[in-house]
Amino acid sequence: MVKLYCAVVGVAGSAFSVRVDESDTVDDLKDAIKAKKPNDFKDIDADKLELYVAKRDGVWLTEADVKSGVADITGLVRLEVVRAKLFSVGLSDEVVSEVDAQEEAAGRGPVNVLVVVPMKKRRVDAGVDEERRFFDTRDFPPLLAPPQRGATVESPEAQWEKLLNSLEWKEPKRLCASSGQNWPYQGESELAGHLVEPLALHYTAWYLQNEDKQNHAINLVLSGPGTGKSRMLDQMKGLMCAAAARSNNRKLKERMENAFVFSVTFENGTSATGSLLDRDNPEFDISYRMLYQLSKDRPNWKKFAKTLKSYRSLELDIEAAIGILAKLKGIDDVKKMTVILCVDGLQKLVNDGTKSCDFYRVLASVCSFLNSSRAFAVCVCSATIQSPVDKALSDSPQKRVFLVPPPLRGHEVLPTKTRIEKQLVDDMGGHGRALETLQLFLSHYTKDQLEEMDPTWMFEKVCDALRLQYGDIFASPFFQDPYNCREVLAAILSRRRYKLFDRIGRTDMTVDCLRSFGLFRWGAEGHLECAFILLVLLMQKLPKKLGEVDNFDDHLTRTVLVWQRFEQFVAFYRRVKSIAYCETPVALSSFHAGARFGAIQDIIITEPTSRTVVEALRQEDTKSSSDDSTCFTNRDGGVKISDMDTIVINGASASAGDLFMRVQLKVGRQNVQCNEVIQCKLLQTKQKIHEDAYAKERAKAANESSDVFLLVTPAQATEFDLPPRCGLVSANEFGRYFGPFTSRAYRSFLEPPNINTASFHELRRLEGVGDATAAKIIAERTIRRFSNLEDALNRLVPSKKGKTAMILSRMHYDDDEADL
């Protein structure tokens, strides 16, 4: 047997002894200490005691050292391995030697073990003030005694006072620190409406002291980077106040208006370090950051956390942090308080999908606090990815509310002055970080400079800036593969309804993972959405045939940056689909997703190759025929449509279809070749497409027994049944059909560039103009403005024939009235 002398850290008084066998374990020693002091360690499990060998620099501490209390355990060896034998950790009978009687009488007898006692939580007995709720001073009477003069120890009482003196109530710093933090907040009404019912249920359950998880909603803001998660958390008090007002519960409304907000983050200044601050207490990663918000001097985060960790006698969990705030504000009962706890950047925590990982344990601790908090607490957590959240809560009935930041209406936060600016704002797809990036770029230039700037150069510079902001997308090996880009593009164009954890096409990428890159959204109806500017970068990476790259990239540039006639735009959109679905059988309804069709069940379309766009020089019949050798002539020569590699734009003012091409269908088990004809119809304001008008357009453009016919118009349409293989894209279907291309489609309805005001770069990018013609136009208009087409023809093309004359006829002149 060995006799060990022990003392409690932070407690002044005499040491006490326990008898154990030197072959016993550390766990046995904890049991012996607990048994020796049953009153002092009341309600504390033996395994929660922390033991240290009381030897510093090879010398035992003495009874005299511990009589006034010991607080500093720096440099002492902690006995952490519960199975370790006492003789193996320096506590054998041989090592723990006795001293003579005189040494003992003088108080110089050795103390072998120091005991650190974890503090009890939430003592709520009547008569116990707030200060004593966080360490039970009644169980340790010496804790209430003032420190003795000259003593170097810090009792829990002293640590408590020191901590309180270093803190004060402070409103949280904004989690969103970027340039968009002051933009008017959008979508508040919709979000508040989503919160009304769960907030009211949570409050009622808290008031009735019902801790059932199904009544207490954890609010989860889940969306990709740069979409407004941090901004939503900054706005959370306003959202909760709006929701409470709608609940018609006066007390709830008053509580939310007077709520204290804690905003903690695992990014920026208090970023996660790859491991929890305390493996045994995941709450500390939240509560320490809450207290950091209250710090008067705001020291370095790591230094602050280290200071809190040194207060071993104070168990500073989330409830304790709220109790400290109550003490600072002079609130006598925590139940009178309302707290909104916002936790940003959970995805930064270590996550391996297990219940022992940091992500799971921290989220679980927040939920545990939410369900049993003495104060009325609302908890909101954000992350860029949802799958680990679902895994963490998969076995729990915890009620959860998913909040998605709404797309921004870019023109409301970023005023524009030029046509290219307006288009670029649309291209950001309502993503906050993308709009901030664009705003910074545009701020360096005046309106005149922007109007003279090459749109191609401007677009590329904006893309370069976005690459820095969204590095994960552009550096990802996934997006280096052209076939992956094609699968993603097809997923967007198809308007297919995805579940969050569905895979994209034939890739291993899930919708949730794709969304976590940023610039992608998973819409409310399950559709995959993407900012147009990213869509352009995806299209640039599409697999293309040899010799087709320059042709497609030039076509893409003109479509993205230059005004085009509506039929030119629709032809490009159809071309993109031919590349996205190349060699992939797909339902005709999915190929033309968003359009309204008649009977097309069991019809599959296969694009055998990607297509190019050609323009016929004359008006051609667009109905299919048995003659597979039919050739049409454009400026580049003959075109054989039976090769199924072209989209033909018909000659000007054609009475038949505006676009046509030969397609391969499979109807049931039968393979069929026919024409696909697209008619682009612009109508005067308030005119509608009705059944008779539709039938006339179809009759002159398509073979009614075999061809696929699609009428595309921005006008409204009356309700009528469509014939088999016939489709309609009207005002009701327009946005669904064109998706992220919609703003480009609407732009084609605007008047063409004005010949007297268009910049050199705007003119040269018009199809068929080029540098020489653009320079000639600018030189002539500096002499005198062009009044009308006749004036331009006389001065630029005296013969009034040829390609240039046709191009000039498509421009806008001072005498023209805008024909929208």
Curated annotation (Swiss-Prot):
Stretches the record annotates as LQLFLAK domain: 18-55
Domain comment, as recorded: The CRN proteins have modular architectures that include a signal peptide, a conserved N-terminus, and highly diverse C-terminal domains. The conserved CRN N-terminus harbors a distinct LXLFLAK motif, which is followed by the conserved DWL domain. A highly conserved HVLVXXP motif marks the end of the CRN N-terminal domains and forms a junction where diverse C-terminal domains are fused. The conserved CRN N-terminus mediates the translocation into the plant host cells. The C-terminal DC effector region contains a helix-hairpin-helix (HhH) DNA-binding domain involved in the binding to heat shock elements (HSEs), which are conserved in the promoter regions of HSP genes at promoters of targeted heat shock protein coding genes.
Region annotation C-terminal DC effector domain: where it falls in the sequence: 125-820
Molecular functions (GO terms): DNA binding
Glycosylation-annotated residues: N268, N371, N703
Chain's gene name: CRN108
Gene Ontology CC terms, in alphabetical order: extracellular region; host cell nucleus
Region (HhH DNA-binding domain): 754-791
Result of altering V769A: Does not affect accumulation in the host nucleus but fails to significantly promote plant susceptibility to P.capsici infection and to suppress callose deposition and ROS accumulation in N.benthamiana
Swiss-Prot/TrEMBL induction comment: Expressed at a high level during the early stages of infection.
Name assigned to this protein: Crinkler effector protein 108
Localization: Secreted; Host nucleus
SUPFAM superfamilies: RuvA domain 2-like (SSF47781)
Family: Belongs to the Crinkler effector family.
UniProt entry keywords in alphabetical sequence: DNA-binding, Glycoprotein, Host nucleus, Secreted, Signal, Virulence
Principal location class: secreted
Organism: Phytophthora sojae
